[in-house]
Amino acid sequence: MAALSDRQKDELHRAMLAYLHAAGMHNAYAALQHDAALADVDPRDRAVGLLEKKWTSVIRLQKKVIDLENRNAALLAELAAAARPAAPGPFLPRPPPRHTLASHRAPVTRLAFHPTWTLLASASEDATVKLWDWEAGDMERTLKGHTKAVMDVDFDPRGGLMATCSSDLTLKLWDTANQYTNVKTLHGHDHSVSSVRFMPDGETLVSASRDKTIRVWQVSSGYCIKTFSGHAEWVREAVPSEDGRWLVSASNDQTSRIWDFSTGETKMELRGHEHVVECAVFAPVNAYPAIRELAGLKPPAPRDTRAKSPGVYAATGSRDKTIKLWDALSGQCLRTLVGHDNWIRALVFHPSGKYLLSASDDKTIKVWDLANGRCTKTIEAHSHFVTSMTWGRAVGASGGIEKVNGDASSKEPRRINVLATGSVDQTIKVWTP
C-alpha cells in the first residue's frame, strides 16, 4: 500500500466497502468500516461500483495485452523469415553479364564449353577459334588453321578433342592436351560446313552442310562413314539426342527432320515454319512434364518407356521469328511461341526442364516458361544480332561428364550455372548467378 497516496487509499477503502455492502458481507463490511474509520456507504458516492469497473478494465486490458503479444510474435516471425536467404531458384541470366569477351575481328558464330575445365571456345567469321578462361574473363589462345569462316565448334564428352567446321569445306580435330595441335582435317563436304557435333560415344562426329547433306565421321580414322540425304536445301544444324539414337536437323528448306542415326533414315519431317529453320534441339527428359502440360497431354502410363526416352520432343527456331515445340515421334506441332522481332538463331533448354531460352537477331535473349508457353523474361543481351548461345556442361553424380542439354540420367548431375552468348557485335558475354 506504500505506493498509494492517502487519497487513493481512501478511495480504495470506500470502493471495497461499497462492494462488501452490495454483496451482503456484513461482518467483513463492519470490520473494514471500523479498521478504516469510514462512515456508512452513501449510494451517491462515486466509489460505488468502482471496484467492479476496475476489475472489468483489468480483464479487458489483459486480453488486449495477450492479443498484442500474439501479434508481435507473428510480426517477429515474419521479420525472421524475410531476413533468411530465399531458397535458390533456377539460375536465369540477368544483366549485367559477368564478362564481356572481346578479341574477334568478325561476328562470333558458335560457342562451346569444355566439359571439365573453365574453358570456353568461340568460333568466328574471322577464320579463328579463340579459347577463353570464362571464370577469369581472360583469353588463353587463338587457333588458326581454317582459311574461311569457322561456323561451329564442339568438345568431345571427355574434353580430349575439339572439333571445328568451316566455310572452307573442312572439319578439323584439335588435341586439347597437346597445345591444341590440329591432328586431323576431314574432307568430304562439297560446300560450307555449318554444324559439327560429337556423338555421345565420343567416337563419331556428325556434320551438316550447305551441300544439303549430313555426314557421319569416324574420329579415330577421320573417314566419312555415312551420308544422310533428304533435305532440299542447306542443312543449318544437326544435333544428336542424349542417347545418340536420333538426330534432329534444321534446314533452309523450311523443315526440320528426325533421323534414325543407325540407319540414316528420316523418321519424321517437321513442317510448319514459313522461312528458313535456323536451329533445332531435342528437349531433355526432365522437360517432358512441362511440355505435356503445355500441350494438354495426359501423363504417360507408368510402363510407357517413351516417357523417359530421349528424343521424344524437339524445339525449332526459324527466320519466321517463331519457335515451335514438336512431338518428334508423330510430327505434331504442340505449340508455337511468338515474341521475337527477328530471326531465331539459337535455342537452349534450361537444365531444370522448366524453361526454354532463345537468342535472336532482335539482340535479345528470351526465357519461355514451358508449362504455359509465356515469355517470362527478356534480356537485352548484345548491341547486334545474337548468333549463338550455350550452357555450361554438367558433372554427373557418378563423376561422368554429361551435357546439360538432353540429360536423361536418373541421378541429377551437378549443374554448372554459366551461360554464354555470341554476337555479330564480335563479343562473347558470360552470364553467371
From Swiss-Prot:
CDD domains: WD40
Stretches of the chain forming a coiled coil according to its record: 57-84
Pfam families named among the record's database cross-references: LisH_PAC1, WD40
Main subcellular location: cytoplasm
GO molecular function terms listed in the Swiss-Prot or TrEMBL record: dynein complex binding; microtubule plus-end binding
GO BP of this protein: cell division; establishment of mitotic spindle orientation; microtubule organizing center organization; microtubule sliding; nuclear migration; vesicle transport along microtubule
WD repeats: 103-144, 146-184, 188-227, 230-269, 272-336, 339-378, 381-429
GO annotation, cellular component aspect: cytoplasmic microtubule; kinetochore; microtubule associated complex; nuclear envelope; spindle pole
SUPFAM superfamilies xrefs: Lissencephaly-1 protein (Lis-1, PAF-AH alpha) N-terminal domain, WD40 repeat-like
InterPro entries recorded: Dynein_regulator_LIS1, G-protein_beta_WD-40_rep, LIS1_N, LisH, PAC1-like_LisH-like_dom, WD40/YVTN_repeat-like_dom_sf, WD40_repeat_CS, WD40_repeat_dom_sf
Domain LisH intervals: 8-40
Keywords, in A-Z order: Cell cycle, Cell division, Coiled coil, Cytoplasm, Cytoskeleton, Microtubule, Mitosis, Repeat, Transport, WD repeat
Function: Positively regulates the activity of the minus-end directed microtubule motor protein dynein. Plays a central role in positioning the mitotic spindle at the bud neck during cell division. Targets cytoplasmic dynein to microtubule plus ends, thereby promoting dynein-mediated microtubule sliding along the bud cortex and consequently the movement of the mitotic spindle to the bud neck.
PANTHER family reported for this sequence: F-BOX AND WD REPEAT DOMAIN CONTAINING 7 (PTHR19848:SF8), WD40 REPEAT PROTEIN (PTHR19848)
Record text about domains: Dimerization mediated by the LisH domain may be required to activate dynein.
Protein name as annotated: Nuclear distribution protein PAC1
